[in-house]
Amino acid sequence: MSKQTYKVCFCFRRRFRYTASEAPREIKTIFEKYSENGVMTVDHLHRFLIDVQKQDKATREDAQSIINSASSLLHRNGLHLDAFFKYLFGDNNPPLALHKVHHDMDAPISHYFIFTGHNSYLTGNQLSSDCSEVPIIDALKKGVRVIELDIWPNSNKDDIDVLHGMTLTTPVGLIKCLKAIRAHAFDVSDYPVVVTLEDHLTPDLQSKVAEMVTEIFGEILFTPPVGESLKEFPSPNSLKRRIIISTKPPKEYKEGKDVEVVQKGKDLGDEEVWGREVPSFIQRNKSEAKDDLDGNDDDDDDDDEDKSKINAPPQYKHLIAIHAGKPKGGITECLKVDPDKVRRLSLSEEQLEKAAEKYAKQIVRFTQHNLLRIYPKGTRVTSSNYNPLVGWSHGAQMVAFNMQGYGRSLWLMQGMFRANGGCGYIKKPDLLLKSGSDSDIFDPKATLPVKTTLRVTVYMGEGWYFDFRHTHFDQYSPPDFYTRVGIAGVPGDTVMKKTKTLEDNWIPAWDEVFEFPLTVPELALLRLEVHEYDMSEKDDFGGQTCLPVWELSEGIRAFPLHSRKGEKYKSVKLLVKVEFV
């Protein structure tokens, strides 16, 4: 037990006692049930792992290992209550079932959600920040598997720069970016890295790109047989430790004109310290939609492929393994499936939402064989993001995000790709891959029956006392914490709830139960956020986590919390019970 002193006005001080965390009432009850004379033996713990933690394959050896790690040398015969509580709240009791790759990785890459970056070279906003290889390295170290580079002639027209065209961003040399990708592509995952090029080059500079890419990537570069188009994408397993180039077939060079940094529409930057709430894709802002139906990403602009190939250097064309491009015509032409050729299509977030109003099932069918990339609308000049569930629920594999930003949308992205060992590839659920007649194709907006109900008990939290100054949340008293608990998923499953606020407590014990009926648990993410209530100002941020529901471990688990930027706190955790009922 320790004491904290807070100043009140100039003359007075308030003193509060800080006490060590204590096991919640239900934990004590469980311990009594699975112990004898105050000791939980190996057999008791083994039964607890099977009955409560739902670890059907747990062995007595697993139980003994837990006792060895959680007990002192003097108490290796079993766990006392404090040691049992320490184990439950410890790092060896995580919320995700598996921390290794466990999905089937032998299907075509069109069958996977892929961790995708947007304008991966930018250090900040979309209009005036620096371009650098550092954000690319950071993204790769976080498990991102798709890196986007906008390539332009340099000022002398004799080399290639990477920058956000028609803005005031300062360029970085392409060769630096390529070397960074080569050096760090497989730091955290062996699965393939896709480099998408937004090409604004002359044919002679395209030849130079081909030389750079071939020299730097060497034998790890994946290229299809000369003169052949892919009829089906290879699998992640077959492409392990390979780099893939994706862009549209080269077209005639058009030199950029004057800088144009003004975008129409409202900047959709984060509205609060921790980020605006994630919008539902059934509550679309029509006025914003009108401003950016065409987006500002010309990666897949309509192109006359026959004309473009006249001057395109063959060595550059040969680099392109994943062809991108929008066929001439409307969205129905874009979504046509060619049985003899697969390709990548890019749509802005607004284009996707507009298309999904009438063509949701066609989009899902398209993504069963082809790749669909979604990118942020042009008015997101502060590098904010959007609701990724819109793309995922329609089967889009590459939902491109500004990784240098932060906010609730990015938390969903980070949470999604904690699945499958954090390798950057997540097998799409079967419902998105089911083919046949239109009645068999998944409709993201359909009202479906409840498949399961997720019950979440938020017992308590701790760790803020160690990771923050004692006046970080409040100058005059300990913090007043509450937790927001909810689901991000298809519209019918999406909801947020909250606990009561507990005043003046560094170790809040809410002990509240929430139930979430889920119609599509395969696309549901559990959201947990802690905030500190402030009567006069905006509530303070106290940590967050987001996790894929389908990979949650049942039972009582320690949920580590993360900062606004997604960095895990050293000590802050929530003790939560997860049940499917």
Curated annotation (Swiss-Prot):
Disulfide bonds: none annotated. The active site is at 118, 164. It is found in: Cell membrane. Its cofactor is Ca(2+). Residues 279-314 are annotated as: Disordered. It comes from the Eukaryota. GO terms for biological process: defense response to bacterium; embryo sac development; floral organ development; intracellular signal transduction; lipid catabolic process; microsporogenesis; positive regulation of auxin biosynthetic process. One of its GO terms (cellular component) is plasma membrane. It catalyses: a 1,2-diacyl-sn-glycero-3-phospho-(1D-myo-inositol-4,5-bisphosphate) + H2O = 1D-myo-inositol 1,4,5-trisphosphate + a 1,2-diacyl-sn-glycerol + H(+). The keyword Electron transport does not apply. Phosphorylation level varies significantly during early response to bacterial elicitor. Keywords: Cell membrane, Hydrolase, Lipid degradation, Lipid metabolism, Membrane, Phosphoprotein, Transducer. Residues 103-248 form the PI-PLC X-box domain. It is a peripheral membrane protein. It is an enzyme of class 3 (hydrolase). Its EC number is 3.1.4.11. The keyword Cell membrane applies. Amino acids 23-36 of the EF-hand-like domain are necessary catalysis but not for binding to lipid vesicles. This is Phosphoinositide phospholipase C 2.
